[in-house]
């Protein structure tokens, strides 16, 4: 089975070993589980990574709850990615996720009424979630009040994050999160 009937997931390799267990590329007929994972902890890592991206894309006001629109946006963005890079869009997405997920974050600890920032390692599932959220947010921000379509903006964001380009919203936010964590060590 292929994603969107076009892209084979069996040839995709996950470069980052820490998130390998949390990026699911098992073949599915339809990328729609209907929220069966919602009540169980850590079950969202069993969702296909493209479905998780689709779910992140339907978070903004206009597309809230409209999965078919988000499905079409991601499908057309994958076609654009393939036409620009001549690669499998799934492998480009997996590289983008591993490049855009922050490895270190900051938590706030209270010591006697004083708040002290402390750097902590990020869990692998949170890295994947944060990377997908930053990619979707960057695409929405690039297309807001712009003539460019959301499909083009999503494709640009994924390609830039896969190439570790600082022009990518996701990569620049990841760098700023890690910079703050480095200062809080």
Curated annotation (Swiss-Prot):
UniProt keyword annotation of Ribonucleoprotein present: yes
PANTHER family: RIBOSOMAL PROTEIN S7
The family this protein is said to belong to: Belongs to the universal ribosomal protein uS7 family.
Any one annotated GO CC term: small ribosomal subunit
Organism encoding this protein: Methanothrix thermoacetophila (strain DSM 6194 / JCM 14653 / NBRC 101360 / PT)
Family annotation (Pfam families): Ribosomal_S7
Keywords: Ribonucleoprotein, Ribosomal protein, RNA-binding, rRNA-binding
InterPro entries named in the record: Ribosomal_uS7 (IPR000235), Ribosomal_uS7_arc (IPR026018), Ribosomal_uS7_dom (IPR023798), Ribosomal_uS7_dom_sf (IPR036823), Ribosomal_uS7_euk/arc (IPR005716)
Function: One of the primary rRNA binding proteins, it binds directly to 16S rRNA where it nucleates assembly of the head domain of the 30S subunit. Is located at the subunit interface close to the decoding center.
HAMAP family per UniProt: Ribosomal_uS7_A
Protein name in the entry: Small ribosomal subunit protein uS7
Any one Gene Ontology molecular-function term assigned to this protein's record: rRNA binding
Record flagged with keyword Heme: no
Gene Ontology biological-process annotations: translation
Summary of subunit composition and partner proteins: Part of the 30S ribosomal subunit.
Gene that this polypeptide is encoded by: rps7
């Amino acid at each position: 089975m292929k994603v969107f009937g076009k892209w084979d997931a069996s040839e995709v390799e996950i470069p980052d070993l820490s998130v390998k267990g949390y990026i699911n590329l098992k073949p599915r007929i339809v990328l729609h589980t209907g929220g069966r994972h919602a009540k169980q902890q850590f079950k969202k890592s069993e969702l296909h990574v493209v479905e998780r991206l689709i779910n992140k894309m339907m978070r903004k006001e206009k597309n809230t709850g409209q999965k078919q629109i988000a499905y079409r946006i991601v499908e057309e963005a994958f076609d654009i990615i393939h036409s620009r890079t001549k690669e499998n869009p799934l492998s480009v997405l997996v590289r983008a996720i591993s490049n855009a997920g922050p490895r270190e974050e900051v938590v706030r600890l209270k010591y006697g009424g004083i708040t002290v920032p402390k750097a902590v390692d990020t869990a692998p599932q949170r890295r994947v979630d944060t990377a997908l959220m930053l990619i979707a947010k960057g695409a929405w921000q690039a297309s807001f009040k712009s003539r460019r379509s959301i499909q083009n903006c999503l494709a640009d964001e994924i390609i830039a994050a896969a190439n570790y380009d600082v022009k990518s919203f996701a990569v620049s936010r990841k760098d700023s999160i890690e910079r703050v964590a480095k200062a809080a060590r």
